[in-house]
Swiss-Prot record:
Its EC number is 4.3.2.10. One of its GO terms (cellular component) is cytoplasm. This is Imidazole glycerol phosphate synthase subunit HisF. The active site is at D12, D131. Signal peptide: none annotated. Gene3D superfamilies: Aldolase class I. GO terms for molecular function: imidazoleglycerol-phosphate synthase activity; lyase activity. Keywords: Amino-acid biosynthesis, Cytoplasm, Histidine biosynthesis, Lyase. InterPro entries: Aldolase_TIM, His_biosynth, HisF, IGPS_HisA/HisF, RibuloseP-bd_barrel. It is found in: Cytoplasm. Pathway: Amino-acid biosynthesis; L-histidine biosynthesis; L-histidine from 5-phospho-alpha-D-ribose 1-diphosphate: step 5/9. It holds the Pfam family His_biosynth. It comes from Hydrogenovibrio crunogenus (strain DSM 25203 / XCL-2).
Amino acid sequence: MSLAKRIIPCLDVDNGRVVKGVQFVDIRDAGDPVEVAKRYDEQGADEITFLDITATAHERDTIVHVVEEVASQVFIPLTVGGGIRSIEDVRTMLNAGADKVAINSAAIFNPAFVKEACDTFGSQCIVVAIDAKKVSPKGEPDKWEIFTHGGRKETGIDAVEWAKEMETLGAGELLVTSMDKDGTKSGFDLALTRTISDSVKIPVIASGGVGKLSDLCDGITQGHAEAVLAASIFHFGEHTVQEAKQAMQKEGIEVRL
């Protein structure tokens, strides 16, 4: 496990544009992924994650161009996810300049795909994204289930068991998003993050719910995550990545400044 904990801004890209508003001061065009990625690079982000939320295959080529463009100008690791369904998709993204590729629903429909991708390209560049919702009634032991389609469709798969299975199949990292917390700005689901982190040996990236800098710190100290991912806290200019790192350092968390 790396000692320094990572901060990863996340950008949703739709048809080649960053969506979920980005409000940087003095950025010419807040919708341009290259501009936004460069700004995060300058702020000291450890990595950047692009999630392509473009629905149609016709527009899929656009994300490839975005990745090529960003990779040519930004030199921190780049993870790309969204619509990755085949070995060819993984190869295309890696060839375009992505360092890692995140596999989400395709892993659920075909777990062997994860193993094949890891065997083909190496575990270090395969991230499995886990979208989980708490399903246990109040007062009962915590239980989370995997949901697909943006948290609308349940699968009946236990999130913690799934995380262990993905590790066994070779995944290099797990991106764990709480669908309950996503967009709430009320902090990570720390119990979910911690339970998965403590169940696997590979790094876990905490995602979903960051509203303030202390939430990022909690993801590491209480959630036992190796990295924390956030979107709007950075996009809306509330905080810079540097401020987040300083807050983490104050908490005794080792970061790369």
